[in-house]
Amino acid sequence: VTDTIMVIAMDGPSGTGKSTVARRLAESLGARYLDTGAMYRAATVWALDHEVDLGDPVAIAAATEDLPLAMSCDPLSEQVELDGESVARRIREDDVTAAVSAVSAVPALREQLVEYQRAVAADDETPIVVEGRDIGTVVFPDAPLKVYLTASAEARAQRRHKQNIELGIPSDYDAVLASVQRRDGLDSTRKVSPLRPADDAVIVDSSDLTLEETVAAVADLTARLEESVR
């Protein structure tokens, strides 16, 4: 990827394989990678560990005002730290997944983290793949390539259910599907930065694609854009 394409924005609902696709794309392009969802999950861990009332947006904003967050932009690293302690595994736990929509809907926290995301991208001249839920619409609305990765709720639930079983985590497909649908509803109806594709985003539906096919489809979009700007 050349200097012409500094930011590749990748958005979409949970369970689409977005993080893996974005990481693999960044690795293949020699680009940096930023998982903004991990930031909101880290903020959620901070709120949970400090016993903040998740029904009180003012309390969440106050507790996360100076979030001591550190993350790696290496696509091969999953480093996420809070106050010097790794939370890379903790951010994926069920209580965090259940609470992250409430925490990430707080406007003051979103403003703080959007500022952080823009600063990270500007900090280095190396191109960066940034993935989340509002990258193409809010964080980098001028990104030359915006990808909206989607899949049916059923396909996403099936993937997560399979992943849970492989990890030895007790899993019930119907419960996983209900969780996916609930998260979709919360993310798409929140007042600040609701989940939606940017008007000029390329929509990639991965319902019937393997992970490798999805990565190839996004890499092809990048290559075609590169050709068009040369």
Where are the model-predicted features located?
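ATP-dependent NMP and nucleoside kinases share a basic, alpha-helical "lid"
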Residues: 88-167
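Conserved lysine of the Walker
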Residues: 18
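Hydrophobic positions on the alpha1 helix immediately C-terminal to the Walker A/P-loop
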Residues: 21
